[in-house]
Amino acid sequence: MKILGIDPGLRTTGFGVIEKQGNKLSYIASGTIKTPDADLPQRLKTILVSVAEVIATYKPDCAAIEKVFVNVNPQSTLLLGQARGAAICALVGADLFVAEYTALQVKQAVVGQGKAQKAQVQDMVQRLLKLSGLPGTDAADALGVAICHAHSGEALSMLGALAPELAKKGLRVRGGRLVG
């Protein structure tokens, strides 16, 4: 199963692609999508188009994205939510099942503790995927989201893979459940 992880951000969105075969995780690719110094709609378009290009290039079976946390600054939270929405639109537009995880869940899955620092996440991602170098923070976070999904989202992914067929029958997957 090929998993695309996304760490959304208005200026920089991280992506990471891994493959899970049995209990083995393999690194495929990672990187960042940097938006131009432009108005909000152009930045969101860059995220949407770039995530779609990542999907077309690596052809993941499913995707996972980090949930937005409520920041001290409500405006920052709203902007992050819009960047996340642009990424989700690209994922759903490619008929991918999208799982969502909090930063706490990702840190627990990767490091073993929810209050881990970014450097600890980077280090564990490097170790878990046997990377020769330390990934950048945004790419490491995205790979962490993918790793979190690999550990906890297998059943959800299988259900999500059936989503196009279920839609033809008037059913859809919502919150890990089938609804009509």
UniProtKB/Swiss-Prot annotation:
Residue ranges spanning the membrane: these are: none
Please give the Pfam families that the UniProt record associates with this protein: RuvC
Query: What does the record give as cofactor?
Result: Mg(2+)
Could you name the active-site residues? Answer: 7, 66, 138
Which N-terminal residues, if any, form the signal peptide?
none
Manner of cofactor binding, per the entry note:
Binds 2 Mg(2+) ion per subunit.
GO annotation terms (biological process): DNA recombination; DNA repair
Enzyme Commission number, as recorded: 3.1.21.10
Q: Which residues bind Mg(2+) 2?
A: 66
Ligand binding (Mg(2+) 1)? 7, 138
Tell where it localizes: Cytoplasm
Q: Which reaction does it catalyse?
A: Endonucleolytic cleavage at a junction such as a reciprocal single-stranded crossover between two homologous DNA duplexes (Holliday junction)
Top-level taxon of origin: Bacteria
| A GO-annotated cellular component | cytoplasm
Protein keywords: Cytoplasm, DNA damage, DNA recombination, DNA repair, DNA-binding, Endonuclease, Hydrolase, Magnesium, Metal-binding, Nuclease
Q: Oligomeric state and partners?
A: Homodimer which binds Holliday junction (HJ) DNA. The HJ becomes 2-fold symmetrical on binding to RuvC with unstacked arms; it has a different conformation from HJ DNA in complex with RuvA. In the full resolvosome a probable DNA-RuvA(4)-RuvB(12)-RuvC(2) complex forms which resolves the HJ.
Q: What is this protein called?
A: Crossover junction endodeoxyribonuclease RuvC
Q: Which gene encodes it?
A: ruvC
